[in-house]
Amino acid sequence: MTRQWETLREYDEIKYEFFEGIAKVTINRPEVRNAFTPKTVAEMIDAFSRARDDQNVSVIVLTGEGDKAFCSGGDQKKRGHGGYVGEDDIPRLNVLDLQRLIRVIPKPVIAMVRGYAIGGGNVLNVVCDLTIAADNAIFGQTGPKVGSFDAGYGSGYLARIVGHKKAREIWYLCRQYNAQEALDMGLVNTVVPLEQVEDETVKWCKDIMQHSPTALRFLKAAMNADTDGLAGLQQMAGDATLLYYTTDEAKEGRDAFKEKRNPDFDQFPKFP
């Protein structure tokens, strides 16, 4: 099915589009298998931040331009002495900020993977909430081959997903795995023919959009709290505070302070 995606903002190295409640962020560097630069990542952070704040967006899809690659990780031609060097000549690893944003954004994020999801590209797949893979998808890590590694989500959280033995295999051997192998190890949620991958992804988004956004927000925060330590607890605590602010009980405390009177909290139930 052909659908008309609306461009919400123009970028140099990504696309940011919208369709019926779905925001789609596309890495647009197909000539290098959608490898990212600091600029690519900065643009993705901006787009994800906009999607987070946009009341019309319920679900976010991350993908790569074309059928050959989702993302092949950091562009090694941009790698300098202390990180990836952008137009400002400052070496940085801002992809770590992007990973964290994808984790804490209070909306489901789905990776739509066609072709290669390798290195840092596979880590982006790992940190997304769900993954719809085309049958031509290829997954793997290359860090130890090129003098790099991801000791955060790319290894620790990966081990939570596929198990410690398999995660060590993925990193120590730097092999590549096809879509069915990725499905078997729990790295993706489903595999569909390449020509159907966007249709299936949109279908999953539409199914998700039928459900309570507050419930989904708390479920994501709860699962993150289990794996992300105090940072995960902070996310869930913030969500709880936000929800509390919407109650009459919280408003009574606020209004009493503004009106310089004692709050009347006796009117609210004390649930067991």
Curated annotation (Swiss-Prot):
Alphabetical list of Gene3D superfamilies matching this protein: 2-enoyl-CoA Hydratase, Chain A, domain 1, Lyase 2-enoyl-coa Hydratase, Chain A, domain 2
Pfam family for this entry, one: ECH_1
PROSITE patterns, sorted: ENOYL_COA_HYDRATASE
Assigned EC number: 4.1.3.36
Residues involved in substrate binding: 33, 72-76, 84, 116-120, 142, 148, 245, 260
UniProt KW keywords: Lyase, Menaquinone biosynthesis
GO CC list: cytosol
Required cofactor(s): hydrogencarbonate
Coiled-coil stretches noted in the UniProt entry, renumbered to this chain: none
Pathway: Quinol/quinone metabolism; 1,4-dihydroxy-2-naphthoate biosynthesis; 1,4-dihydroxy-2-naphthoate from chorismate: step 6/7; Quinol/quinone metabolism; menaquinone biosynthesis
InterPro entries xrefs: ClpP/crotonase-like_dom_sf, DHNA-CoA_synthase_MenB, Enoyl-CoA_hyd/isom_CS, Enoyl-CoA_hydra/iso, Enoyl-CoA_hydra_C
Chain residues that bind hydrogencarbonate: 141-143
Record site feature (Important for catalysis), residues: 84, 245
Domain of life the protein comes from: Bacteria
Catalytic activity of the protein: 2-succinylbenzoyl-CoA + H(+) = 1,4-dihydroxy-2-naphthoyl-CoA + H2O
Gene Ontology terms describing biological process: menaquinone biosynthetic process
UniProt-recorded Gene Ontology molecular function terms: 1,4-dihydroxy-2-naphthoyl-CoA synthase activity
Family recorded in the similarity comment: Belongs to the enoyl-CoA hydratase/isomerase family. MenB subfamily.
Protein function: Converts o-succinylbenzoyl-CoA (OSB-CoA) to 1,4-dihydroxy-2-naphthoyl-CoA (DHNA-CoA).
Protein name: 1,4-dihydroxy-2-naphthoyl-CoA synthase
Natural source organism: Staphylococcus epidermidis (strain ATCC 35984 / DSM 28319 / BCRC 17069 / CCUG 31568 / BM 3577 / RP62A)
